[in-house]
Amino acid sequence: MQAGESAALLVLTKQGLNDLIKENKVAPGSNADFASSGMGVVVKHGAPKPDISTPEAYKQTLLKAKSIAYSNPASGGASGVFFAKTLEKMGIAAEIAPKTHHPPPSGNSANLVVSGEAELAIQQEPEVMEVSGVDIVGPPPGDLNNITTYSAGVPADSKEPNGAKALIKFLQTPEAAAVYKARGLKPV
């Protein structure tokens, strides 16, 4: 869209779609949220699951971990950027920095747990679900979790607006919701 390409339907993060709405690139009233995902904390399969039930327990778990993997914030990945800010907010960024490991660009932090390079990994739950050899401990507690909402909308210049609207309607059905749940997304 930014480069002048056209599309019949847009599926983006809610923020990304809202930015296009402000630029009048989305047909008014055509947008709808359909799923969301949060971050997941993972350990190697069979390892004891640390306590992450409260902000303080989560903080202590991070401080006690020998090594932690998360997406490199410099690459712009939402979970890595959010987690780096969370470490600063919790006042432990300096303590965590020496034991931080980042996967290669487009890599998955959970793979570093499987390989033994990291004891814990934090990344979007649907992404870590795809890696065998890890167990999901759960989401970070409360506002220490980054919830991403996914939205769909019809481009203002769509040549197939009726088809796009039908697909958006389908994205909100129980059938679609079952697929989201199986992939670690939550229907909204």
Predicted feature locations:
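Exported/periplasmic ABC-transporter solute-binding proteins
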Residues: 2-8, 13-37, 43-188
